[in-house]
Regions:
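Gly/Ser/Thr-rich helix-start
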Residues: 24, 30, 64, 68-69, ...
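N-terminal beta1-alpha1-beta2 submodule of the flavodoxin-like/Rossmannoid cofactor-binding fold
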Residues: 1-51, 101, 118-134
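Short, glycine-/small-residue-rich phosphate/pyrophosphate-handling segment
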Residues: 53-111
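Active-site-proximal catalytic alpha-helix in oxidoreductases
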Residues: 108-120
Length: 134
């Protein structure tokens, strides 16, 4: 597990990995600035030398709102993976909270298929948000 700040000092770990699972918070309908900076930093060597070609990729995001345009963040991650010729793997869970007999404790409660999405109330700390189902 690497933060984006750590990742830029450990390219060898990412280059040697069979899969890279990426995650970043969604702010204002987009990936966070530090993650975007990480993405841009891959263009000089990883992209130019196709070091991630053929790797498995997956991703997740978390935001303060139930919707919050998190789909856009997942699409950014998928596009980034595709630019590196990686193979994206979706969430693989059926839709969650879309029936009268389900609740917020069900997996994939916000019903995304491209990747994992979480929601954290902005007035609560990380000890309680996001909920364990996310």
């Amino acid at each position: 597990l690497l933060t984006v700040e750590e990742a830029t000092s450990h390219w060898d770990c990412l280059d040697a990995a069979d899969a890279i699972i990426m995650g970043a918070p969604t702010y204002m309908g987009s990936l966070s600035a530090p993650f975007k900076s990480f993405m841009d930093a891959t263009s000089h060597v990883q992209y130019a030398e196709k070091r991630w070609d053929g790797k498995i990729a997956a991703g997740f995001t978390n935001g303060g709102s139930r919707g919050g345009d998190k789909q856009n963040s997942l699409i950014q991650l998928i596009t980034f993976a595709a630019q590196h010729q990686m193979h994206w793997v979706g969430l693989g869970l059926s839709y969650g909270n879309n029936r009268s007999n389900t609740n917020d404790e069900i997996l994939n409660r916000d019903t995304y298929s491209l990747g994992m999405v979480g929601q954290s109330n902005i007035d609560q700390g990380s000890e309680v948000a996001p909920p364990s189902s996310d």
